[in-house]
From Swiss-Prot:
Protein name in the entry: ATP synthase subunit a
Domain of life: Bacteria
Gene Ontology terms: cellular component: plasma membrane; proton-transporting ATP synthase complex
SUPFAM superfamilies (alphabetical): F1F0 ATP synthase subunit A (SSF81336)
Presence of the UniProt keyword Membrane in the record: yes
Alphabetized PROSITE patterns for the sequence: ATPASE_A (PS00449)
Role of this protein: Key component of the proton channel; it plays a direct role in the translocation of protons across the membrane.
Alphabetic keyword roster: ATP synthesis, Cell inner membrane, Cell membrane, CF(0), Hydrogen ion transport, Ion transport, Membrane, Transmembrane, Transmembrane helix, Transport
Assembly notes: F-type ATPases have 2 components, CF(1) - the catalytic core - and CF(0) - the membrane proton channel. CF(1) has five subunits: alpha(3), beta(3), gamma(1), delta(1), epsilon(1). CF(0) has three main subunits: a(1), b(2) and c(9-12). The alpha and beta chains form an alternating ring which encloses part of the gamma chain. CF(1) is attached to CF(0) by a central stalk formed by the gamma and epsilon chains, while a peripheral stalk is formed by the delta and b chains.
Gene: atpB
Entry's localization field: Cell inner membrane
Cystine crosslinks: none
Amino acid sequence: MAAEEHALTSTEYIKHHLTNMTYGKMPDGTWKLAETAEEAHSMGFTAIHLDSMGWSIGLGVIFCLLFWIVARAANAGVPTKFQSAIEMIIEFVDSSVRDTFHGKSRLIAPLALTIFVWIFLMNLMDLIPVDWIPQVAAFVGANVFGMDPHHVYFKIVPSTDPNITLGMSLSVFVLILFYSIREKGVGGFVGELALNPFNPSNPVAKALLIPVNLILELVTFLARPISLALRLFGNMYAGELIFILIALLPFWIQWALSVPWAIFHILVITLQAFIFMMLTIVYLSMASEKH
């Protein structure tokens, strides 16, 4: 459905495509789907982005099923093209882990593989034309549930939702804490925060610089999950916004712009998945090092 066919202005069209399907508790105590951005905001912490959650879980299930099917069908004979592609991905991730992670853990390679493929699949949804699936959702909402189609919101790219990217980065942050404390102990971990980057030999100067070290190290430590999340979110949100802006143009111009941008965006979605994976490995490697 072209943008011109909507009874929406350009601004309303953009806002509609950048709004999540949100379910939550209203201030009056009722639970409902938000029909406006204001209603979604009023739901506060109880707001659930059903579209982001559904797509991310669904793509995670698809990822597990695909790899399970390939593992079941794997044999020593001539592999299929799909099996060869999966093996190339696994070997690429495994070599990246071996080259970057210097500790000992059987968790890192499967974690890195999950992060890379899962984020890649979520990013890949950005290549689906912006109106296709939301149009189906609006049709179902209007004809099955009697909703106003202009108030049926349905985003299909989970990585354009900061809640998804922050959730993933916070999981990585918990692992960083776990590996840091496991390898260095609580005292060693606290000492690393309190005695770096300034660690003079004079005990008085050392004591005076502990608050400065704590502030600097805590800011650096807490910035890691935030930067991980916002980097992925920002790049994918910007890419989605460009696709939406292209959809507002006349049909004959859309193809001239969307195809080159989609081809370039293939590099972006792959690179963002790779960067998130590599930074996760680097952070966990740093957490596993003893000083």
